[in-house]
């Protein structure tokens, strides 16, 4: 099992260097020594900012929902195509991205290539707005999506390669925190940027929208630089620590998918059913809060971003909590139930929506910290890239279909029916969590073990 091969943890800087990778033959400054805590923290910083630009630009349409619809003369269903076109390529390419990381490019070159796709895609997206061609904007989102989700696979694989062990949940939480910092900044800043450009141009329109989106592309350039630096540091660590000696030597095959366990397939179902109730809702949330609660556009953007605002500081804290307690399945169940309650409050009550959105932010963070690391517990290490890629792939199949469905439901039936639709998806996720718990218990698996028990299992005999 993957959880039996412990790597050095993030907080274990003083562990005996003879356990695991070979120590450097010469004395190095702590921040330059791959075995030292300071160096691994440096790597973690670049690892976290790797997805900053992608997350910042992913929700550009959500933060500019009213402006995009007005400037490009769209209905809601057409607007949601911007999210669908992001997701469609990853139904296949995200899975292949994990395969390419494992067999073709390697983690370092693959990360740089995917970062380039993100940057080029955002530039095409902005150019489409400048030229007033919505089809070109969709092309940009398509290219952006090819890089965005595959980059997330690379980020997850980097995390496991460097920090697999008892702090892996914390590292996943920190990664999510920094990525969601990008989403939060986007939600609260890009509208202001649009307003300033509108004042300078003298009017709104496609040109104003295009310039705003082109400015947003600078964050993707920043993430590309992080990918280059991270690749250099990883290559250097491989040379110093002779990491190649510790590789399994096994060659991954695409046919390995048929050997994925029932537990892994249930994790995939939870992932899809849960996230289709999060991202499409945020994509359409601005107008929802304006129409139902009478918020101004500025207030609507603020509350629509609260999920990301909360997840930024909460993710590492909740990741640390999951690390120390274990019981991943129970934490996932709690997150799904809390999210279900949040959507029910938004759908059927007029309570202050800050309550529901705050609960949604906490539960979203908790699920990410508890769900994604479970993949490393149920697949061999040499298949991690493919497993994470497949997880992202079917997630994007769900998001592509549900984004179009959500836009159509909203145009025809309104927000109440849309919320009922999201609630049904969460009920499916809850059923999958219950089945995962029962199957893991029956098979005496390790997904719901306490942290102490899991640590004992991981120690060599």
Curated annotation (Swiss-Prot):
- Relay the domain remarks: The dileucine internalization motif is required for lysosomal localization.
Listed transmembrane segments: 37-57, 81-101, 111-131, 134-154, 264-284, 302-322, 331-351, 359-379, 390-410, 416-436
The subunit structure is:
Homodimer. Interacts with lysosomal protein GLMP (via lumenal domain); the interaction starts while both proteins are still in the endoplasmic reticulum and is required for stabilization of MFSD1 in lysosomes but has no direct effect on its targeting to lysosomes or transporter activity.
The entry's family comment says:
Belongs to the major facilitator superfamily.
Please list where the region (Disordered) is annotated: 1-22
Q: PROSITE patterns, alphabetically? A: MFS
Which classification does the entry list for the species? Eukaryota, Metazoa, Chordata, Craniata, Vertebrata
Protein name, as recorded:
Lysosomal dipeptide transporter MFSD1
Q: What positions carry the motif Dileucine internalization motif?
A: 10-11
Known PANTHER family for this protein?
MAJOR FACILITATOR SUPERFAMILY DOMAIN-CONTAINING PROTEIN 1
InterPro entries annotated for this entry? MFS (IPR011701), MFS_dom (IPR020846), MFS_trans_sf (IPR036259), MFSD1 (IPR052187)
Could you tell me which species this protein originates from?
A: Danio rerio (Zebrafish)
The topology of this chain with respect to the membrane is: Multi-pass membrane protein
SUPFAM superfamilies according to UniProt: MFS general substrate transporter
GO biological processes: dipeptide transmembrane transport from lysosomal lumen to cytosol; protein localization to lysosome; protein stabilization
Q: What is its main location?
A: membrane
Q: Which is a Gene Ontology cellular component entry for this protein?
A: lysosome
A GO MF term: protein homodimerization activity
Reaction catalysed by this chain? L-alpha-aminoacyl-L-arginine(out) = L-alpha-aminoacyl-L-arginine(in); L-arginyl-L-alpha-amino acid(out) = L-arginyl-L-alpha-amino acid(in); L-arginyl-glycine(out) = L-arginyl-glycine(in); L-alpha-aminoacyl-L-lysine(out) = L-alpha-aminoacyl-L-lysine(in)
Q: Give the matching CDD domains.
A: MFS_MFSD1
